[in-house]
């Protein structure tokens, strides 16, 4: 009777040893980047599981050349620079396949993206990593590129009704809900709160607002949510909006800065002498926030983990292009909440230039 047991592969070895697929691949093929002890463990486990290399598949993969473009905004750099770094890190760790990675930039969400796509797609890429701003404007772009044979991977947000092959982002609804709960715990008396957003036609930004509003209504009915302010990721617009809001009659006592475009708002508060008089929850982590969190001027920041988002988006896209995983990945990372008490666990990861507010 024939035995139909599945032959062990690299993934099985990696799972058994709790190491990465890349580590196993390097150890099996005697490539640099793996210490001798790990290499020995990999070879022992390969022998134990009865691993046999698939020569035909290996030959096809080694001869495969994949071209990928990352088309992303330049601003807000506190988010997009580490996102690009995550993509670059994953590309450098790719083994067994030739990957050509190009970066294309445009100024900010909903400004210059169509031109950037037109320029990038004059070259035919196997895959594109991108952040969909206005979902309605992006749907025809995604459809056109998909029909041309390009696999489209969303990162940082999503366009769920499009032909994209998958998406990687932080759970936006939960991020907004956490921010509302934090303010609700701090603000026990009747007061106004406000949300600074970027572009509500972007799913990520809209979901944060929904999560914030629904949680606030449930947990803090004594807090009134003022109309949302959209800066369209323009620092000057956010600064002017903050000045006008905080000098108005219905001045809020709590703020949720739901994108990384927080510096201009914080600067406006500092100039008005209100930075220590308002409860603030920000988004992401960059040098300018660190002293404010340390001094208690910011309650907490919701870290969207952009490096991890970029890394996973690249890895999932490559796996799809190589035929290793044809499932459409829908990955929502748990946001990390950074307080003064756990700031030291995250501050070493910050690499952006210092841009002090105070």
Predicted regions and their residues:
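N-terminal helix-turn-helix DNA-binding module of bacterial transcription factors
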Residues: 1-63, 357
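Amphipathic helical "hinge" segments at domain boundaries
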Residues: 53-115
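Proline-centered loop/turn at the N-terminus of a beta-strand
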Residues: 67, 149-153, 166, 192, ...
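Hinge/beta->alpha junction and helix N-cap segments in small-molecule ligand-binding domains
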Residues: 73-79, 102-113, 134, 168-178, ...
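Hydrophobic alpha-helical
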Residues: 128, 132-146, 212, 227-289
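Flexible loop/hinge segments that line or gate small-molecule binding clefts
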Residues: 134-174, 286-294
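A conserved helix-loop-strand patch within extracytoplasmic ligand-binding domains
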Residues: 177-193
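Hinge/cleft segment of the Venus flytrap/periplasmic-binding protein
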Residues: 216, 305-358
